[in-house]
Structure formats: structure tokens, C-alpha cells
């Protein structure tokens, strides 16, 4: 019996799961029905949203910041992060496709997210909490007086709202707002917090200044990372595994059009990200050049570090020759006219071009993920300066174990004199 107890203890130690402050284990994949008794009746809910103009890939970065806040809260109380439904993003411009109220499971693998922090979809929150009501909404903002030069000071204070609120009270004095496209959702109270610092700076406010069971942080992009580039950052980033159906589409495309498979490319992916720890440079990548060519608002802003199409193609051909690659995969947001021009300049380029039915199924966000997945598996990758789309590909390649020299590269502007290449943020386990 004693021996059996020792075995059980060893197994328990080997399979760590997040434990709440109350001592109860959190099990990934729990449904509302499973946990309605016990923890679910006591736990508190953290919700958040981001400035509407911000894109898909910046929002993924904000998730990492909020996840670190949740980990801080979990040291004291039972909390769960409610995933903000996707929708109404500036870059998602495909017509006639319904792209609001999109759950995270359309784009990411929820069991993987749950191995890092407890998360639930918004509709599960409604079911668990008793309705579409959020007890407290905090709108995060800077300080009206700005940051005074000198010593950096992390601080948070309840302050009058600087900008007009994007919430209005109805006749019942509930607050109506965007709320991710859920018109029936109401906020019971809305106030503003001025913040200057990392995400966990608001933890004392949530733990001590409010007893609200559900708290939403609007404009969460105003919070900084707790530990950018550290182990906690990478744990959360690694947990953001793309949805299995999108990875499968990307893998099929690699195989059919780019002669690329995990076995041939020396990739050793694990379905469980917590078990995946690879040496940088151990993966070879597929026999093609991966390219992210950002256009649209990047060129409208007359950025000096974005090349002309001719300049980009010249660099692409140079890289293909240097690395002896005869295939090139291009992910771009170029308008149709530029795409046609690019095709004339680079007739051999390969692109993932979904049918209307596929676009309706995967949506613009899913197509972006498929593009990133294919770029992440290339033998060599070159991206666009300061693009979060390219940054996310850098991270994905780092996770997959590709040589950093084949990852942290960007196009230079035609007249750019000092073309500084992206910084290597080394993965931490």
C-alpha cells in the first residue's frame, strides 16, 4: 500500500496542473456542468477588450499580458479568464462573411490554452454566471498629466475618464457598449483606471478594491508585459497552439504545393506543448522561401523601411539563389492590382488562396493563421519591418526549433540606409 502511495505521488508530481488558492485542482477541458458545483460557484471572472483599431496579431500579444495578470490573481483567489470573442477587425475585410462573435476555438486549441491558465469562452461565462451581465468594467487609460521624465514608476489610480466613454446607460441604468457584438450584454458599473506599468499592477485593485464577481478590463493594451521574453512569456506564447483544423489545412498545402512534410523537414512537433522542448537549429524547414510582404496601410504611411514590389522581388530572387530554393511562398495583404503585378514579377510564387467556401469556413483570421503556419515551416523566412504578423511568425519558428539566422530577417526599404534586422528573442523553457 505504501509503495502504491509513492507511485501515486510521483505520478501527481509529474503531471502538474494549475492549483487555485483554495487548493482545488483546475482540470483543462472542464465544462460548465462539470464544475458548476464547487469552484465555479466561487470563482471570479476576468474579461478584457482591446482598442477597436488594433489587429489580430497585436491582440494575441495582449492575451499574453492579461494571462500574466491572471497568474498573479490565482496566487490569491480562484479566477478564470473569459476569452474575448473575435470580430469587427479592420484587416478582416472579406465581404458577405459573418465575422463577429467568433469563439477562440475557431482559431486556437482551447485544451492547450488551458494547460497554462484556466480559460473559458464568453458563452460559457454567460451560462455559468447567470446571464450576460458584467459587474464591473474598468476602462484603462494613461495619466492625464502624462509621464514625467525621471524614474519610471509603476502606478494605478482611479481617475476621471479622459476620453468620452464608449458606453451609454439605458433606462434601467445598465451600461450598453460593443461587448464583442453581444448586444444583450450589459455592464452594471463603468469607471476609469489610469495605469502606468505591467499587467499585474492592477491585481491589488481586483483583489482589494472591488468585490465584483466579473470584472472587465477595457483597453487592456495599456498594460505592459510583466516579463517580456522570459519563461512565463514563452509558456503563454507556446500555449497559443493554433486550432487543429487550421494546422491540418496548412500541412496539407505544404505537402501538395511545397514538397514539405514534418519528417522531411526534420520537424518534431508535439501535440502537447508542455512536452515540446527543441534545440534551436534542430529543425531544417521545408524546401521553400517563406515571405511576409506587408502592404496596405504600411505603404500608405510612406514607411521608408517597406520596399517597392520590384525591390521586394529582387531580394526574394537573391535569397532563393543564396539558399538554393526554387519555391517561394508569399503571404501578403496587397490589394488585387498589386497582387497581379507581383504575379508578373514573380510568376513562380505560391500563395494560399482559399475558395469562397473555405474563406467562409476559416474566416480571415483562419486564413492569416494558415499563412503564418506555412511561413513558419519554411527553410528561410523574411518578413516586414515592425509588423506584428511577422513577429508572430518569428515566435512560431522559434518554438519549432528553426535556426534563428533563418528567422529574424526583414525587407529593407529601397532607399533605406541603415537596415537594422529584427532582434532575436530567444525562447525560454
Swiss-Prot record:
Task: Kindly indicate whether the keyword Transferase belongs to this entry.
Answer: yes
Q: Which residues bind GDP-beta-L-fucose?
A: 53-57, 292-294, 371, 388-389
The record's annotation in CDD domains points to: O-FucT-2
Q: Where does the signal peptide begin and end?
A: 1-21
**Which class of enzymes does this protein belong to?**
transferase
Record-level Gene Ontology MF annotations: fucosyltransferase activity; peptide-O-fucosyltransferase activity
Keyword rRNA-binding found: no
| One of the Pfam families matching this protein, by short name | O-FucT
Its predominant location is: endoplasmic reticulum
GO cellular-component terms in the record?
Answer: endoplasmic reticulum membrane; Golgi apparatus
Residue spans making up a coiled coil are none
**Its function?**
Catalyzes the reaction that attaches fucose through an O-glycosidic linkage to a conserved serine or threonine residue in the consensus sequence C1-X-X-S/T-C2 of thrombospondin type I repeats (TSRs) where C1 and C2 are the first and second cysteines of the repeat, respectively. O-fucosylates members of several protein families including the ADAMTS, the thrombospondin (TSP) and spondin families. Required for the proper secretion of ADAMTS family members such as ADAMTSL1 and ADAMTS13.
What is the recorded name of this protein? GDP-fucose protein O-fucosyltransferase 2
